[in-house]
């Protein structure tokens, strides 16, 4: 694709609205081609390094399947499979991998790490997730929303994110809304709002693109008329146990449940989640939450909503692969 060749994919605001739209169009085409058996391999002979300082199911599988579909080969470097930042600097790692690979994916910690990789690798670098941003997830989310509201422009849609909005998902949603004009409402306790500077920047851009960004603590007001309600986990296994009670007390009123879905007043409202979700007690963490905090039947989302017809979370999960494929094809093929 013109203009994308050898570009990095580090955060959404590195792109223009037109470029973002082009990536979504390419993803939709690649998805249709795969389904119809007409996919054309554009990455034959390419070698791709996947650096994972944080484990992941969806991100790893998406990159691997997308690469294989397109004829590329991958090397997985897991949390214990490389010396990045420990025995070898990020700068040196970038220069080594850049001599061997045609593209590098990084999923891990600070945004400065993926930025340094991009500065020194000499090949396209893609952000699979950092503490600050999760751009590949938002590409999948935008494609999923387009599929479920065909014919509607993003500035005619309303997305609500309920819960902890100060994380990489909240930041990337702000950037997505800025570029698309998507009506975005972050419904969260004020302590869980993103940094004011990013909100201000993205709100100004969103208004230029016909959209609006709202932050509110009021659940009923925030979800009214929503087309999509989105949430993410409140706690993770890596966090100190003392944080769990504090986080749950802060966010309990922002659980996505049938009452919240009904408060939208939209019988066609859809539920989104980037996964994994703690919607039951069938996981180690889910059991702990149920036993210690009485969160039976779900934490950030109830099992009832997660398993309902309104839930399109597995469409999202599939679209991770198609949109990641679009990023690789756009940046590695002329």
Swiss-Prot record:
Pfam families: OTCace, OTCace_N. It catalyses: carbamoyl phosphate + L-ornithine = L-citrulline + phosphate + H(+). PROSITE patterns: CARBAMOYLTRANSFERASE. L-ornithine binds at residues 168, 232, 236-237. The keyword Cytoplasm applies. It comes from the Bacteria. Its EC number is 2.1.3.3. Keywords: Amino-acid biosynthesis, Arginine biosynthesis, Cytoplasm, Transferase. Carbamoyl phosphate binds at residues 56-59, 83, 107, 134-137, 274-275, 320. SUPFAM superfamilies: Aspartate/ornithine carbamoyltransferase (SSF53671). InterPro entries: Asp/Orn_carbamoyltranf_P-bd (IPR006132), Asp/Orn_carbamoylTrfase (IPR006130), Asp/Orn_carbamoylTrfase_sf (IPR036901), Asp_carbamoyltransf_Asp/Orn-bd (IPR006131), Orn/put_carbamltrans (IPR002292), OTCase_ArgI (IPR024904). Its main location: cytoplasm. It is an enzyme of class 2 (transferase). The keyword Metal-binding does not apply. Pathway: Amino-acid biosynthesis; L-arginine biosynthesis; L-arginine from L-ornithine and carbamoyl phosphate: step 1/3. One of its GO terms (molecular function) is amino acid binding. Belongs to the aspartate/ornithine carbamoyltransferase superfamily. OTCase family. Reversibly catalyzes the transfer of the carbamoyl group from carbamoyl phosphate (CP) to the N(epsilon) atom of ornithine (ORN) to produce L-citrulline. This is Ornithine carbamoyltransferase. It comes from Shigella dysenteriae serotype 1 (strain Sd197). The lineage of its organism: Bacteria, Pseudomonadati, Pseudomonadota, Gammaproteobacteria, Enterobacterales. The gene is argI.
């Amino acid at each position: 694709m013109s203009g994308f060749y050898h570009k990095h994919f580090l955060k959404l605001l590195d792109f223009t609205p037109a470029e973002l739209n082009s990536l979504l169009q390419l993803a939709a085409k690649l998805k249709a081609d795969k389904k119809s058996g007409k996919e054309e391999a554009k990455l034959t002979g390419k070698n791709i390094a996947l650096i994972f300082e944080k484990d992941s199911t969806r991100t790893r599988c998406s990159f691997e399947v997308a690469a294989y579909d397109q004829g590329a080969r991958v090397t997985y470097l897991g949390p214990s499979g490389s010396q990045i930042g420990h025995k070898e600097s990020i700068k040196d790692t970038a220069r080594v991998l850049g001599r061997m690979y045609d593209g590098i994916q990084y999923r891990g910690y600070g945004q400065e790490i993926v930025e340094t990789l991009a500065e020194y690798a000499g090949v396209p670098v893609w952000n699979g997730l950092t503490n600050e941003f999760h751009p590949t997830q938002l590409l999948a989310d935008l494609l999923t929303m387009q599929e479920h509201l065909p014919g509607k422009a993003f500035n005619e849609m309303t997305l609500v994110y309920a819960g902890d909005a100060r994380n990489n998902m909240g930041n990337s949603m702000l950037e997505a809304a800025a570029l698309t004009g998507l009506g975005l409402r972050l419904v969260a306790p004020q302590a869980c709002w993103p940094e004011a500077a990013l909100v201000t920047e993205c709100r100004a851009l969103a208004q230029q693109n016909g959209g609006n960004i709202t932050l509110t603590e009021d659940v009923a007001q925030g979800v009214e008329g929503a087309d999509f309600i989105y949430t993410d986990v409140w706690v993770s296994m890596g966090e100190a146990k003392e944080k769990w009670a504090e986080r749950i007390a802060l966010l309990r009123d922002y659980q996505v449940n049938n009452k919240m879905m009904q408060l939208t007043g939209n019988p066609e409202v859809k539920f989104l989640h980037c996964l994994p979700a703690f919607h039951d007690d069938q996981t180690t963490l889910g059991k702990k939450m149920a036993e210690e905090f009485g969160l039976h039947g779900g934490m950030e989302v109830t099992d009832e909503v997660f398993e309902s017809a309104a839930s399109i979370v597995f469409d999202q999960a599939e679209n991770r692969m198609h949109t990641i494929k679009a990023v690789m094809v756009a940046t590695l093929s002329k």
